[in-house]
């Protein structure tokens, strides 16, 4: 079974079994919704158990979650630095033009058929996502995911076509 990373447990929150999660999912409200099932993986990326979300709320830069049946800090403190993953079969179908992060990360980025690099990470700083493009011999390029910049995405070909506005890439 394939699993996709949706968050990392970075700490406990209070004494009632809540955990601070650093989310790496594109649909946190949906992914951490009460009743949803996730898989827990240890620091060595080994499957530990399936868990069910009992509660979820946002707090600053974290998602605060609680697992069903684990209502005290003693139940969950051993999960610090563990990963939360979703099974591939639990991913919802997306509309045309929508993509999961795991589909975008690893794609090659081209401008005018010239390879710029590979998407290595997706940041969520505010209004739109920012793709971090790893380039050979240059600093990473921070590419906003907005229509004037991203011209096309072809998952099957592993390719993204872009037009970089003047001033966005200071290494050219």
From Swiss-Prot:
Pfam family, one: PRC
Assembly with partners or alone: Binds ribosomal protein uS19.
Gene Ontology MF term list: ribosome binding
Assigned protein family: Belongs to the RimM family.
Record GO cellular component, one term: cytoplasm
UniProt main location, coarse: cytoplasm
Compartments where located: Cytoplasm
Record protein name field: Ribosome maturation factor RimM
Function per UniProt: An accessory protein needed during the final step in the assembly of 30S ribosomal subunit, possibly for assembly of the head region. Essential for efficient processing of 16S rRNA. May be needed both before and after RbfA during the maturation of 16S rRNA. It has affinity for free ribosomal 30S subunits but not for 70S ribosomes.
Gene3D superfamilies: PRC-barrel domain, RimM
Superkingdom of the organism of origin: Bacteria
An annotated GO BP: ribosomal small subunit biogenesis
Keyword check for Zinc-finger: no
Residues in PRC barrel domain copies: 96-168
SUPFAM superfamilies linked: PRC-barrel domain, Translation proteins
Keyword presence, Electron transport: no
NCBIfam families tied to this protein: 16S_RimM
Domain notes: The PRC barrel domain binds ribosomal protein uS19.
Keyword tags: Chaperone, Cytoplasm, Ribosome biogenesis, rRNA processing
Gene name as annotated: rimM
Entry-linked InterPro entries: PRC-brl_dom (IPR027275), PRC_barrel-like_sf (IPR011033), RimM (IPR011961), RimM_N (IPR002676), RimM_N_sf (IPR036976), Transl_B-barrel_sf (IPR009000)
């Amino acid at each position: 079974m394939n699993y996709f990373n949706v968050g990392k447990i970075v700490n406990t929150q209070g004494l009632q079994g809540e955990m601070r999660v650093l989310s790496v999912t594109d649909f946190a409200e949906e992914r951490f919704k009460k009743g949803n099932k996730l898989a827990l993986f240890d620091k060595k990326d080994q499957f530990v158990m399936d868990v069910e979300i009992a509660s979820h709320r946002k707090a600053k830069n974290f998602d605060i979650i609680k697992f069903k049946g684990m209502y005290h800090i003693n139940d969950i403190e051993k999960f610090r630095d563990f990963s939360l993953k979703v099974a591939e079969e639990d991913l919802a179908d997306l509309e045309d033009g929508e993509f999961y992060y795991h589909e975008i990360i690893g794609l090659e980025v081209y401008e005018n058929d010239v390879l710029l690099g590979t998407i290595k990470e997706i940041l969520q700083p505010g209004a739109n996502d920012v793709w971090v493009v790893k380039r050979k011999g240059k600093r990473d390029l921070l590419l906003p995911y907005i229509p004037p910049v991203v011209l096309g995405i072809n998952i099957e070909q592993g390719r993204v076509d872009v037009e970089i506005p003047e001033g966005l890439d200071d290494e050219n």
